[in-house]
Amino acid sequence: MIKKRRTNRYTEVYAIAQYISMSAHKARRVIDQIRGRSYAETLIILELMPYRACYPILKLVYSAAANANHNMRFNEANLIISKAEVNEGNTVKKLKPRARGRGYPIKRPTCHITIVLKDLDVEEEYLDSFAFEDKYIHKK
């Protein structure tokens, strides 16, 4: 499987959790609440929401922030969640033994969660550098 990323590598950092053992519908219920919010506000929301999906998403947001801090030297106070998506994963199928030699199927859905964090200060500097370049260098 080839994963293509069309993110700006200078202003965005992402983290992916695959094969999380819950349905994508239940994870989307939580992801929709945090999309577009700041990092600090997201942590508060995830700690106070009463859903089972909050814990793996909270771990993923922590991981994305650690990636941003360690790899790109971003400040956690300036991070926002620019993209958050949930996709369906494989369905784990089992058979539960029943009476008279029968077997009932058990379907356990999984999902893949992607969190993309963006640093607002770095993005402004990045866009300003292009504005300078367009204004002075590419002018004929």
Swiss-Prot record:
InterPro entries: Ribosomal_uL22, Ribosomal_uL22_bac/chlpt-type, Ribosomal_uL22_bac/org-type, Ribosomal_uL22_CS, Ribosomal_uL22_sf. Its main location: plastid. Disulfide bonds: none annotated. Transmembrane segments: none annotated. The keyword Zinc does not apply. Keywords: Chloroplast, Plastid, Ribonucleoprotein, Ribosomal protein, RNA-binding, rRNA-binding. The keyword rRNA-binding applies. One of its GO terms (biological process) is translation. GO terms for molecular function: rRNA binding; structural constituent of ribosome. SUPFAM superfamilies: Ribosomal protein L22. It is found in: Plastid, Chloroplast. One of its GO terms (cellular component) is chloroplast. This protein binds specifically to 23S rRNA. The globular domain of the protein is located near the polypeptide exit tunnel on the outside of the subunit, while an extended beta-hairpin is found that lines the wall of the exit tunnel in the center of the 70S ribosome. HAMAP family: Ribosomal_uL22_B. Part of the 50S ribosomal subunit. Belongs to the universal ribosomal protein uL22 family. This is Large ribosomal subunit protein uL22c. The gene is rpl22.
